[in-house]
Amino acid sequence: MGSNLPSQPNLRLTIIAADGLYKRDVFRFPDPFAVATVGGEQTQTTSVIKKTLNPYWNEMFDLRVNEESILAIQIFDQKKFKKKDQGFLGVINVRIGDVIDLEMGGDEMLTRDLKKSNDNLVVHGKLIINLSTNLSTPNTNQANGLHRSHIQPSTSSGLVPQVGASAAHPAASPAPIDPAASNPSLHPQRVPSTNRPPSTVAPGAAAGATPTNTQGSRTNLSSFEDSQGRLPAGWERREDNLGRTYYVDHNTRTTTWTRPSSNYNEQTQRTQREANMQLERRAHQSRMLPEDRTGANSPNLPETSQQAPTPPAGGSANAVSMMATGATTAGTGELPPGWEQRTTPEGRPYFVDHNTRTTTWVDPRRQQYIRMYGQNANGTNTTIQQQPVSQLGPLPSGWEMRLTNTARVYFVDHNTKTTTWDDPRLPSSLDQGVPQYKRDFRRKLIYFRSQPALRIMSGQCHVKVRRNNIFEDSYAEIMRQSASDLKKRLMIKFDGEDGLDYGGLSREFFFLLSHEMFNPFYCLFEYSAHDNYTLQINPHSGVNPEHLNYFKFIGRVVGLAIFHRRFLDSFFIGAFYKMMLRKKVSLQDMEGVDEDLHRNLTWTLDNDIEGVLELTFAVDDEKFGERRTIDLKPGGRDIPVTNENKGEYVELVTEWKIVKRVEEQFNAFMSGFNELIPADLVNVFDERELELLIGGIADIDVDDWKKHTDYRGYQESDDVIQNFWKVVRTWDAEQKSRLLQFTTGTSRIPVNGFKDLQGSDGPRRFTIEKSGDPVALPKSHTCFNRLDLPPYKTYETLEHKMSIAVEETLGFGQE
C-alpha cells in the first residue's frame, strides 16, 4: 500500500480529545496519550496528559494517505506502557475513503466510540478527531519543534485494525481539570477491573520508545468556555474531585450540573431558581421530629381558612375533627401572665405566649386533656381518645406531674431522673406495635432535650442579617458572640424587613443559610460520589486561607439549629455523621465517598492478591499541583501489602480517604459544634438518628415514589409489589424516612421529587429487583437506589421482614 501513497502529506489529522476513558485502576487515574498509525508505516504520538479520564490534546499531524488507507488511533496509559497490555485504553479504526474525499477536499470532525482490542479488555469512552485536506495553515506542532516518538505498537497488544462505523456527529469535548479540584489518588498500582478477574501482570516488551510528557503550546480551553463555545457572562466551568463537570454562576453564586444554554436568559433562570427555592422552603418547613408530632404545633401564619373552634365532644367524629382543625375548648377568665389572644385574617383565634415567643391554637385556660392516638379497624391513625387529667387516677410511684410556664402538662420520673410529655397512666403509643427504633429515637430525643445543657438561657440573642449577604453577615454575627449568648432566645431580623421572630424568621434564616454555607461555590464542601445533593468536606478547602474559621462557624450553626430545635436543609454522607459521633469509619462508609475505591478494596479483601497487586502501605496525594507520598504507617512505602496484612491496609486506606484528609477541617467544625452541643449528649443517637435530628423528617409522597420506580424481575401488578406499597403507605413519616435511608443512603428527597433521584453515576430511579430467598431479609444498594426484595408469599411476612431490615441496619452501606 505504501507505493500508492503520495510523496507529500495530503491530510492533516488533529487529535482533539478523548472523553470518559475507562478507569482501569481505581487507585489512580491514567496518564493517557494517543498513537496514530497509517498502514503500519507512519506513526505519530501525542503528548501525555497526566491523571485524567478526559484528556485534551488538540495536536496536529500531517499524513500521507489514499482512500484505502486505514487510520488507527490507539490510546494508552503511559504509566503502564511497558506492561503486557501496554495500558491499553481503546482504539478507533477509520478508512479514509469512507469519511473524506481526498480529491474534492474537505474538513470532517469525527466522534467515534473507542473499541476493544483482541485481548477483550474493557474499554469505554469516545475519541474526537478532525481530518482536513487543508494544509495551508502552519502545523503548530512542527512550528514549535515538538519531537514525536515514533512508536510501533507491540504485537503483545493484539491490535488488529478494523474498519470503524460511519462518522458520528461531533460531541462536546472534555474540559481540562481545574487545579483547585485536583484528584488525589492512591499510590499508582495495577488493580483489576471488577468486570473480570485479574490476571498476573507479566512485563511486556514495549517496542520503540516510551512517550515522554512533552508539553508544547497546545490550545487549552479556558474555564470560561468548552467545546460548545463560550459560556454566558459570569459563568465558569469546573470539575469536582471525581472528574464531573459542573458550572458556577458567579452572578448568583450558585452551582449546577447543567450547562447554561446559548440562549441563556438571566430573568428566566432567576424565575426558575425562585420557584425551586419555594418548593424547597415548603418541604423544609414541613419537616419535624417524633416529639414534635405529639404536642401542639405552633401555627404558621397566615393560615388558610379554618373552621371556628368548637368544644370537644365525646363522639369520635368530633375527636377526629379536633385533630384536623386544632379546635379546643374555649377557656374562661383571665389569660395567664404574658399571654395574648389574637385573630387570624380568617377570624380564627390563636394565642401568643410572649414569655417563650411562641404561638399556639390551644387556649391556655382550657381544661387540660390528654390525647392518645390509636388505630381503627383499617389500621389508620385516626382515633383520638381524650380523658381529663382528673379522671385518670393517681400517678405511679416516683412520678410527678408539673406544668410548664405555658400551662402544658409534663411528667417527671424521679426513678430515672427523666421527663416526658407522655402520661404514664395511659397506654403508651410507644409501647405496643411500635418498632424498637422508634421507641428508642423518641425517648432519646426526650432525654436529649430535657438536659440542662440544652435549656434556653434567659435573655435574647439578636442576629441581624441581609438576605442577599446572609453567609457573610451570619459569620460576622455568630462568631462575634460567645457560646453562652447563642444559647439565649434567638431573635432573627432581616435587614429592611419588619417582623417579630416567633419561629418563622428563624426557620427561614436556617433554611437560607444552609443553602449558602454548604454551596460548593465556596469550596468548603463538595458533592459526594453517591449523588449530587449529599455533601462531604472538600479536602482542598485550604484554597480559602480562612477555611478553618469558616468550618468552626458552620459547626456553630449546626449546633445552634439543634439547640433551638430548627432544621438545616442539608444532608451529609453517612460517614460524616459517624465522625460527629466519634465512631470508627468502615469500608462500607467508603461507598458514599468513592464507589470505585470501595469496590476495589472489597475485591482486595475477598481475593488472593499475591503476585497480582503490587501495593505498599502508602498513598499518593496531590494538592494544588504538588504531589507527595504519604505513609499510612511509619515506613509504609517500603512495606508490601500481602494476604496477611491486607485487612490492615484496607482499614488504613479507608481512614485516610475519609478522615485523615479532612481532619483539620472536621476538628474545626466539631470545636464550633461542641460549644453548643456537648459531645456526651449527642452520642445517645446513632448516625441515622443524627441525620434526622439535623435535617428533620420529610413528608414523603408515596404516590410520587411509586410513579418513579422501576422493577426488575417483578411487574407492578405482582402481589409482592402491591404488598410492598401497601406496607409503605401504612408506615408513618419517620418509618418512610428510615426506609429511604436504607435504600438510598439519605432521607433527602430532590426538590422536584423522586423523578430527580440521583445515583453514583447520574440520574438513577428507585428500583425494586427480584432477588434473594423468601426466608432472607431485603438488601439495599444505596449507590444505585436499588432494593433487592425476595418474593415473600404474604403481606405479613413482607411487612415483618421489611421492618427488621430497616430497624436493625447499622451504618449506611448495605452491600
Swiss-Prot record:
Please list the residue ranges that the record marks as compositionally biased, kind Low complexity.
165-185, 202-212, 324-333
Cite the record's Polar residues compositional bias ranges.
213-226, 253-270, 295-308
Ubl conjugation as a keyword? no
Read off the Pfam families from this record.
C2, HECT, WW
Where in this chain does the record put each C2 domain? Answer: 1-112
Residue span, HECT domain: 482-815
Q: Which GO terms describe its biological process?
A: cellular response to heat; cellular response to L-arginine; chromatin organization; free ubiquitin chain polymerization; mitochondria-associated ubiquitin-dependent protein catabolic process; mitochondrion organization; nonfunctional rRNA decay; poly(A)+ mRNA export from nucleus
Give me the stretches of Basic and acidic residues compositional bias.
279-294
Q: Which Gene Ontology terms cover its molecular function?
A: phosphatidylinositol binding; ubiquitin binding; ubiquitin-protein transferase activity; ubiquitin-ubiquitin ligase activity
InterPro entries, per the entry: C2_dom, C2_domain_sf, E3_ub_ligase_SMURF1, E3_ubiq-protein_ligase, HECT_dom, Hect_E3_ubiquitin_ligase, WW_dom, WW_dom_sf
- Chief localization class? cytoplasm
- Residues of the WW domain: 229-262, 333-366, 393-426
Give the GO cellular component terms, alphabetically.
cellular bud tip; cytosolic ribosome; endosome membrane; Golgi apparatus; nucleus; RSP5-BUL ubiquitin ligase complex; ubiquitin ligase complex
* UniProt catalytic activity: S-ubiquitinyl-[E2 ubiquitin-conjugating enzyme]-L-cysteine + [acceptor protein]-L-lysine = [E2 ubiquitin-conjugating enzyme]-L-cysteine + N(6)-ubiquitinyl-[acceptor protein]-L-lysine
Cell compartment(s), UniProt: Cytoplasm
Oligomeric state and partners? Interacts with creD.
- This chain belongs to the protein called Probable E3 ubiquitin-protein ligase hulA
Pathway(s) it belongs to? Protein modification; protein ubiquitination
EC number(s) recorded for this UniProt protein: 2.3.2.26
Q: Of which family is this protein a member?
A: Belongs to the RSP5/NEDD4 family.
What does the function comment of this entry state? E3 ubiquitin-protein ligase which accepts ubiquitin from an E2 ubiquitin-conjugating enzyme in the form of a thioester and then directly transfers the ubiquitin to targeted substrates. Probably involved in the regulatory network controlling carbon source utilization.
Q: Where is the active site?
A: C783
SMART domains, per the entry: C2, HECTc, WW
Keywords (alphabetical) are: Cytoplasm, Repeat, Transferase, Ubl conjugation pathway
Question: Which SUPFAM superfamilies does the record cross-reference, listed alphabetically?
Answer: C2 domain (Calcium/lipid-binding domain, CaLB) (SSF49562), Hect, E3 ligase catalytic domain (SSF56204), WW domain (SSF51045)
- Look up and give the organism this protein is from: Aspergillus clavatus (strain ATCC 1007 / CBS 513.65 / DSM 816 / NCTC 3887 / NRRL 1 / QM 1276 / 107)
